[in-house]
Amino acid sequence: MGRLYVVATPVGNLEDITVRAIKILLSVPVIACEDTRRTGMLIKILKERYSDFLYSHPNPPPKLGGGNQREGVKKYLSVRDWNEAEQVEKVMQLLETDDVALVSDAGTPLLSDPGYKIVREARKRNFEVMSVPGPFAGAAAVSISGLPTNKVMFWGFLPKKWDLEPGLTHVIYESPVRLNKTLKKIEMKYPEAEIVIACELTKIHEKIWKHKNGEDEKVRGEVTVLVNFGRSW
């Protein structure tokens, strides 16, 4: 019987990946991911950069479970929001004999990414589910925002209908195309709110700044919006 490893991957800077994550990803025979090409490229880079180091280390990657392999072809299984329900059973069947790593395109899986149904079913069937923690864009943005951190609400992408509770720092993901529309809605509903925007975290063009009401923002790449009003501190 295999294990399910929920593995965090970098949100931008590859050097943020943990040694343990590298060991797991290079050892498991099966990886459930969003974009198989993107994850395949990540594995290729990890092998090129770290394979020799890891396997010459006094503490090399441990033998995991069924199907453990250093070399050879890995199986990649695409898991998206629209097909996760039908992929659950495939992952469960693979876990009967093999270890499986679950990753997202970037950051910590399940947080605004698919994977919840797989983890839930694996636990229901008594498979061992292991956390391999690491980068999370929402937490990274909060930690450098200067906003209160004692009470934080993570939204991911906002639903169609939403209200923000006072006294919390709200963490919102948004696309560059919809950013200004969302900012205007927040300004109208909560004119006293303090808004901080973080873009391209850990990348070359990383930027974080306080938004001024009424201004249009020109951004690119991944965007995290942080909102606080009625401060808790």
Which ranges hold each PLM region?
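Acidic beta-strand-to-loop metal/phosphate-binding motif
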Residues: 32-34, 101-107, 111, 170-174
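Short amphipathic alpha-helix with an adjacent loop that forms part of the alpha/beta core around
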Residues: 88-95, 162-166, 214-217
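Alpha-helix capping/helix-boundary segments
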Residues: 37-39, 108, 137, 178
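Glycine/small-residue-rich loop that forms an oxyanion/phosphate-binding "nest" at active or ligand-binding sites
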Residues: 54, 75-136
